[in-house]
């Protein structure tokens, strides 16, 4: 019975969770899987951590100290900070995987680190949704947007996003726990809030049922608020933008449409496997264990990779930068700065023109220097 996994000593015997809360069945996994999975996680997490700290750190520094403060820079700085904090705590989970799922940082850090990771997921998703909605409003209501779109409102919106993410991530502070199993300490979700050494008692079935209900509530809430609803809003916003641009013939170049499609597809591909497998975990007895022992580590790695891809997708691809010769600072500055014109996308042709002017200027500088 699947309820047994929530308050039975069996869960401590054959299931371990990594830093993100999923369980890997080590008894049923093949020796090859047991060896490859930790190595795979260490490599991917390390790569994501390096790229995420570098990319998001660069965005934070340039947008904060090198640029004029605008609504766009507020969005991107908050997004970069959320991803940066996520990557700061990745080394703990790299160590966890490298030590064959042995948690050495204590119960408090088990709760705090996973709370921060969950908080980052919600913050990033909500900020991407806010950015999409902001761009949509700028296209649909350019005059209203110019009159009411302010830095103060952007800060208030970001504050609300962080508070909401805190509330939705709070279950990690309650349910995350540690247990010593066969000489190893695992960090896992103890939804029943029962001690690992507890034995069956008359109220055992009630405790188990309560634990399962909490697991369902947390998983479904995470899927709806952290994926399905944001994806629906983001998709609706960009479809509206595309429809508006095509109807008004404001963009002859199809590059903006390709960027929009790339953003939506990438976000969907990064998080869809993660949430799908977590939903399947609610009925794990009906699914082969190999699906979780191999699928969950892979899905988690793909999901966290989104934190290092955001600087690329939302900054470097944000405008029409077709020439690699353009300086990195210019790319970031142009991407994070406010768009000229009544809305973000109607001025797309000005971006192309501005890029070409920048390139011509750089060529002229070279010619002058050679003379």
Curated annotation (Swiss-Prot):
Q: Which residues form a coiled coil?
A: none
| Transmembrane annotation, as ranges | 40-62, 74-95, 113-133, 153-174, 223-243, 260-280, 299-318
Q: Which residues are sugar-modified?
A: 7, 190
A GO BP entry is: negative regulation of interleukin-12 production
Residues where Phosphothreonine is found: 340, 370
List the stretches on the Cytoplasmic face of the membrane.
Answer: 63-73, 134-152, 244-259, 319-371
Topology in the lipid bilayer is annotated as: Multi-pass membrane protein
Protein's job? Receptor for the chemoattractant adipokine chemerin/RARRES2 and for the omega-3 fatty acid derived molecule resolvin E1. Interaction with RARRES2 initiates activation of G proteins G(i)/G(o) and beta-arrestin pathways inducing cellular responses via second messenger pathways such as intracellular calcium mobilization, phosphorylation of MAP kinases MAPK1/MAPK3 (ERK1/2), TYRO3, MAPK14/P38MAPK and PI3K leading to multifunctional effects, like, reduction of immune responses, enhancing of adipogenesis and angionesis.
- UniProt protein name: Chemerin-like receptor 1
Query: Which species is this UniProt entry from?
Result: Mus musculus (Mouse)
Supply the source organism's classification. Answer: Eukaryota, Metazoa, Chordata, Craniata, Vertebrata
Q: Gene that codes for this?
A: Cmklr1
